[in-house]
Each structure stands twice: as C-alpha cells, then as structure tokens.
Curated annotation (Swiss-Prot):
It comes from Brucella abortus (strain 2308). Residues 7-235 form the ABC transporter domain. Keywords: ATP-binding, Cell inner membrane, Cell membrane, Membrane, Nucleotide-binding, Translocase, Transport. Belongs to the ABC transporter superfamily. Thiamine importer (TC 3.A.1.19.1) family. This is Thiamine import ATP-binding protein ThiQ. It is an enzyme of class 7 (translocase). ATP binds at G37, P38, S39, G40, S41, G42, K43, S44. One of its GO terms (cellular component) is plasma membrane. SMART domains: AAA.
Length: 241
C-alpha cells in the first residue's frame, strides 16, 4: 500500500509569458482533485510545478511535509501520465511497465511479481507481449497506469490523460484510477476540460482563472446552481461551442 501524501503549494509564484501565476493551496493526502479552467489559466503549469518540470520563482512546494521545491524531477515522489507519448513504441506492454521498476529492464523476482500484479489490476492479462501499436487508446493508458502502480509513488498527476477517449471509455478509466486510489491511498491530481469528470468522481474541484485559484470546493457544491459565478460562466462558454 502506498502511503498518502499531502501536497502543499505555499505562496508559489511563477510567470509564463505575460501570465503571472500565484498558487496557495493544500490537497489532503489520499484525495482526488480535478483542476479545471480556461485555456492558458495555468492548469498544466500547476502540475508541472509539482512534478518538477518547472521551478517557481518564489514560494514553497512540499509533499508529505518535505520541501521539494528544488528537488530534481526524478527524486520527487510523483508519477505523471500525459494524453500521449507515455509508452515506448519498440517495447512490449510488459517492458513498458518494467521501466517503472528498473530503467535498465533488469528485474528480480519481486519486481516481476509486481509487474504481473499491476497488469492484472488494470485488466491487461494476456497482452503482456503486445506492442503499443496493437493496443487501443484506452489500453495504452492502462499500461501507463500499470507503470504508475509499480513505481509506488504516493502522488499521481494526470495531465488530460484521458481527453482523447470517448465519454464511456473516459469514465471507465476514471473509475479505474479512483479504484486504485482507494486501494493504494495515493493522492491524485488531474487536469480536465470536462468539469463533469469531477462530479463523476465526487472529487475536490479546483478552478483556475488567469493563473490563480479562483475557487475550490467539493464538485457537488461547485457545480451546483449556487456554485461560483466565474465557474458557471466558464461552463456556459464551453457549452456554447
């Protein structure tokens, strides 16, 4: 079981182009949070700061009480899944997951058992020897999630990981992630352009606007008629397209 880890961004400031971003928030360990907001509002930057792809100009980022602000990406207790390019095309499903245990693909018996267990948990038994090109989009993302499991990091970041999937398949993947979160205790942050995903998961919803956290709260409250006006306006604009 993966230990839960709080995530704290304390007065974190970062500039991207002409957008000055400011984040001050705590995500409780074991929670699932959905990050929503207009394009350019800072959603991916928010995740990149936590993952270590970006370094804040000021402020502190801590995970489980440990300051990781200047910790190298590889040393952070974080796994990240993107919409595309999560897998190596020349490796099999099994080998892609093996990388989560050993970058040189040298696994011991315990590692192999962990990989087999992860593939079973995401429903990929019998597909271990296939290459990514032989998989559907949903199956490829399941491989990426299996690799997350064998890495045993307490924080999972999803940057629009399921955006290219249809609604039914996207919900299947969200349900899988939520099931694994409950089993492992990991903290999950996901960027999505579909606020209803947060409702589907009964998640914490964090609404970003112009590089700042404009509102946050339980999705059931945030997406109700009594929710923040800025969020209602954003959703209304989305549905007008």
């Amino acid at each position: 079981m993966t230990a839960s880890a709080d995530i704290r961004l304390s007065d974190v400031r970062f500039s991207y182009g002409e957008t000055a971003m400011h984040f001050d928030v705590t995500i409780t360990g074991g929670e699932i949070a959905a990050i929503v907001g207009p394009s350019g509002s800072g959603k991916s930057t928010f995740l990149n700061l936590i993952a270590g792809f970006e370094t804040p100009q000021s402020g502190i980022i801590s995970i489980n009480g440990v300051d990781v602000t200047h910790l190298p990406l590889a040393d952070r207790p974080v796994s990240m899944v993107f919409q595309e390019n999560n897998l190596f095309a020349h490796l099999t499903v099994e080998q892609n997951v093996d990388l989560g245990r050993s970058p040189n693909l040298r696994l011991n018996e315990e590692d192999r058992k962990a990989v087999a267990s992860a593939l079973a948990r995401v429903g990929l038994q019998g597909k271990e020897k296939r290459k990514p090109e032989a998989l559907s989009g949903g199956e490829r993302q399941r491989v990426a999630i299996a690799r997350v499991l064998v890495r045993e990091r307490p924080v999972l970041l999803l940057d629009e990981a399921f955006a290219s999937l249809g609604p039914a398949l996207r919900h299947q993947m969200l349900d899988l992630v939520n099931k694994l979160r409950r089993e492992t205790g990991m903290t999950v942050l996901m960027v999505t352009h579909t606020p209803e995903d947060a409702l589907h998961l009964d998640a914490l919803l964090i609404f970003l606007d112009n590089g700042k956290i404009a509102a946050q709260g339980p999705a059931t409250e945030m997406l109700s008629r009594a929710g923040p006006e800025a969020l209602r306006h954003y959703i209304g604009e989305m549905r007008s397209f």
